[in-house]
Amino acid sequence: MEYGEEPPIKRTRRSFLMLPDDLVLNCLARISRLHYPTLSLVSKTFRSLLASTELYQTRILLGRTESCLYACLRLRTDSELLHWFILCHRPHSSKNVLVPISSPSFTSPSLPGVVVVGPDVYAIGGGSKNKNVSIYATGSKTYNALSSVMIMNSRSHTWHEAPSMRVGRVFPSACTLDGRIYVTGGCDNLDTMNWMEIFDTKTQTWEFLQIPSEEICKGSEYLSVSYQGTVYVKSDEKDVTYKMHKGKWREADICMNNGWSLSSSSSYCVVENVFYRYCEGEIRWYDLKNRAWTILKGLGRLPSLPTSHSNVKLADHGGKMAISWEEYMFVDREKKIWCAEIAIEKHQNGEIWGTLEWFDNVFISKTPNGYVGLVHALTATVW
């Protein structure tokens, strides 16, 4: 160094974690939760921060709510276990992928009813071959009906037990309205007393909803949905949809009834108070004014969907529609799961159009014969 020359500046490498904790949490809280699984791989410190109560509280203060899509899969290697996944961004890519999260430890050869209330996912009832509880028969299969209820907190992805139902239910149908869960059917010998149970998520208590007519409760399997501020229920026994009106049940519009059936279970959803359903490659919405099911226009870029209803799941995704479906690859003997997100626009002339925002292959099975079953797809609101 020559005389009079300034000494070189010694550069020090600074870490993001050298910032004050409050500032670090503020930065992380502004990042979408879809990136959290990738960020948790950076270090133990990041992993701890992302799971902290402080980050959760910071997101609440900033109003950082977002919708997270969860999928429940059944794999043939352990066909009675249900595996849960969350949709996340793939590292170093703009694509999305299903990432496994913790799953409840109990097994269920039948499918529990699943609903979401805020950030909590409820898995209700189901069937077991091992527990000595009430018996339920359907077709050639016999199940032990479970009354248990499990709750997953979508912030921590941990499961815990909730108060059990009063009646065991193998294939219950469930929907939510104003913070209450309405559970219908799923057991034999239903009567006006046990046809439906209601769970108050605030008080964590169950109560039966008594109905005046046994005609309504004939059957064991049902579809149910919260729509237009009330609860609609459809029975497998009678091709009739009932709706609750001022505390009483009455038959719903016949045109609406014709648009959904048990063969298309879970292939329907309500977005912004509009009822949508999937049928034979088309998504339709119920035009309440004209009492007709109308094709959702604008989806020309959406890949062809399977014609089997059970392979397609619709879900309200924060005011948009999430579509999940299966595809079997005969050459590779693999099963793929795809997801798409549809933005919905209501026009002044009463029409509703959809716009495809993205679609990705989010899961490829690695099990023998490429088997994987898409059981549920639903969205939770997370801070």
UniProtKB/Swiss-Prot annotation:
InterPro entries: F-box-like_dom_sf, F-box/kelch-repeat_ARATH, F-box_dom, Kelch-typ_b-propeller, Kelch_1. Residues 13-59 form the F-box domain. Kelch repeats lie at residues 134-179, 180-226, 267-316. It holds the Pfam family Kelch_FKB95. CDD domains: F-box_AtAFR-like (cd22152). Keywords: Kelch repeat, Repeat. PROSITE patterns: FBOX. PANTHER family: F-BOX/KELCH-REPEAT PROTEIN SKIP4, GALACTOSE OXIDASE_KELCH REPEAT SUPERFAMILY PROTEIN. This is F-box/kelch-repeat protein At4g23580. It comes from Arabidopsis thaliana (Mouse-ear cress).
